[in-house]
UniProtKB/Swiss-Prot annotation:
This is Probable hercynylcysteine sulfoxide lyase. It catalyses: S-(hercyn-2-yl)-L-cysteine S-oxide + AH2 + H(+) = ergothioneine + pyruvate + A + NH4(+). PANTHER family: CYSTEINE DESULFURASE, CYSTEINE DESULFURASE 1, CHLOROPLASTIC. GO terms for biological process: ergothioneine biosynthesis from histidine via gamma-glutamyl-hercynylcysteine sulfoxide. The modification N6-(pyridoxal phosphate)lysine is found at K215. The keyword Lyase applies. Probably catalyzes the conversion of hercynylcysteine sulfoxide to ergothioneine. Ergothioneine is an antioxidant that protects mycobacteria from oxidative stress. It comes from Mycobacterium tuberculosis (strain ATCC 25618 / H37Rv). Keywords: Lyase, Pyridoxal phosphate. It comes from the Bacteria.
Length: 390
């Protein structure tokens, strides 16, 4: 059964508005957790800035874009629940984590994170010498709060790192409760909101929130953001500190120093403004609604098991193969034969937890129940068509 509000006027209005703001889709896009479709406004803003660079020079154009970029920073701070955060643009989420951990103060380097931590994040943590301690979890991968409280109080790490929604599974972590726990224990909380910003509520005032432009906010690729509580920012020690002969730079300025694609940052800032204009709460509700519909229509597709509970408040649906279905072959068939864009997620996404590859879909608010019905039918065909390729 579909959720009763699946085709509600409010949902249709948001879907229509989102769809009209973008170029027509070439096929069926169910891959926003990888990269959403940009709007005309974001595309035009980036292009106009690039043209302005050609007209007046890159540095003059960057100065002219300062107000737009400041608005983008303010939007990120608001969506993180930390209005006074110092916000640094990066090239993506992984770059943001690299900047943060490479600048972390003190000699002690321990952090607690989920067993399902994103593989590349684990690589960055190891590169910066952090000892990783797994947080206790429930069967569905959600943090076990009571057990985590005992663990963190008994042997506090230097920081807690929480990926609010994983790359390999659409379970939303209880972020607000973890934030409260970390506040009570006086532990810095770092939130990986790559899959969270614009998708689930991240406004909990964590000490650090970092995210990507290209996913649920639907901005350009190659841009990310690092938002840090001012008190913590002052404690960070940039890997490349400003030399004595340079003018004084704040820590945030040191972290953000270097070459940048300002046009992409402008596009990201515009996309953030569009997200706020559409209403973050309405977007979150619509995304959760689509996740509910997807899991319902896919529950009985032979050869696959839906990983998330039907009412999980996220738009991501993960399909684990059973009876020998091949996620990589199915993903390729869906793209080549039906122009349906999905994600094949290998075990490297979560090397400490994911036992086998999975198939992931992630609709945005412009997708419909009919789209998800069409995907279910195509999945049946793809599974049958690729069954002999094993």
């Amino acid at each position: 059964m579909r959720r009763s509000g699946a085709n509600s006027p409010a949902g249709d209005s948001l879907a229509d508005r989102w769809r009209a703001a973008r170029p027509p889709v070439a096929g069926l896009h169910l891959d926003s957790a990888a990269c959403s479709r940009q709007s005309f406004a974001a595309l035009d803003a980036a292009a106009q800035h690039a043209r302005h660079e050609a007209e007046v020079g890159g540095y003059v154009a960057a100065e002219a874009a300062a107000a737009v970029l400041d608005a983008g920073r303010a939007a990120v701070a608001a969506l993180s629940g930390l209005p006074d955060a110092e916000v640094v643009f990066t090239t993506g989420s992984l770059h943001a984590l690299d900047l943060l951990l490479g600048s972390w103060p003190g000699e002690n380097r321990t952090l607690a994170c989920l067993p399902g931590e994103y593989g590349p994040n684990l690589a960055v943590m190891a590169a910066h010498g952090f000892d990783v301690r797994p947080l206790p979890t429930l069967q569905d991968g959600r943090v076990a709060l009571d057990d985590a409280a005992f663990m963190l109080a008994d042997d506090p790490p230097d920081l807690v790192h929480l990926t609010v929604v994983a790359s390999h599974r659409g379970v939303a972590q209880p972020l607000a409760m973890v934030a409260q726990l970390c506040t009570e224990l006086k532990l810095p909380l770092v939130v990986d909101a790559a899959q969270g910003l614009g998708h689930v509520d991240c406004a909990v005032g964590a000490d650090v929130t970092y995210a990507s432009s290209r996913k649920w906010i639907a901005g350009p690729r190659g841009v990310g953001v690092l938002a840090v509580r001012p008190e913590l920012m002052e404690r960070l020690r940039a890997r490349l500190p400003a030399p004595d002969w340079m003018p004084p730079l704040t820590v945030a300025q040191q972290l953000g120093f270097g070459e940048a694609n300002v046009a992409a940052r402008v596009g990201f800032s515009v996309a953030l403004g569009e997200h706020l204009a559409c209403g973050p709460q309405a977007i979150r509700a619509r995304l959760a609604e689509l996740g509910d519909i997807a899991r319902t229509v896919l529950a009985d597709v032979s050869g696959w098991r839906v990983v998330e509970a039907v009412d999980e408040p996220s738009a991501i649906t993960t399909l684990a193969p059973i009876d020998g279905a091949d996620p990589a072959a199915v993903r390729a068939w869906l793209l080549s034969q039906r122009r349906i864009v999905t994600t094949y997620a290998g075990v490297e996404r979560a090397p400490l937890e994911l036992p086998a590859p999975v198939l992931r879909i992630s609709p945005h608010v412009d997708n419909t129940a009919d789209d998800l019905d069409a995907f279910a039918e195509a999945l049946v065909a793809a599974t049958a068509a690729t069954s002999g390729e094993r």
